[in-house]
Amino acid sequence: MAKLSSINKNEKRKKLVKQYAAKYEKLKAIANDKSLDETERLIARLKMAEIPRNANPTRVRNRCATTGRPRGYYRKFGINRIELRDLGNKGLIPGLTKSSW
């Protein structure tokens, strides 16, 4: 089990990303638009710098839904490899079977 503070910090970041997503995307589009004047693009970049760092989507870490483990995460299931194996062996994940050939 991961530290509760790490899990809570990541949840807070997810909330911030969601809150600032529209504003961030709009400013990013303006900053990357080559057809606009350089001063407009600079202003957009300065406004982007005012947005909190934790509102950047790259700072969010994928974590297991059950344990909070940050490594070995499977996006399709939302859990880590260890939980995937345990739940798969118990038959709790529909359609997941042990391979045999």
Curated annotation (Swiss-Prot):
Which keywords label this protein?
A: Ribonucleoprotein, Ribosomal protein, RNA-binding, rRNA-binding
- Do the record's keywords include Amino-acid biosynthesis? no
Q: Which GO terms describe its molecular function?
A: rRNA binding; structural constituent of ribosome
Which superkingdom, per the lineage? Bacteria
What InterPro entries does the entry give?
Ribosomal_uS14, Ribosomal_uS14_bac/plastid
Entry GO terms, CC: cytoplasm; small ribosomal subunit
Which cysteines link up through disulfide bonds? none
Q: Which NCBIfam families match?
A: PRK08881.1 (NF006477)
What exactly does this protein do?
Binds 16S rRNA, required for the assembly of 30S particles and may also be responsible for determining the conformation of the 16S rRNA at the A site.
Report what the protein is called.
Small ribosomal subunit protein uS14
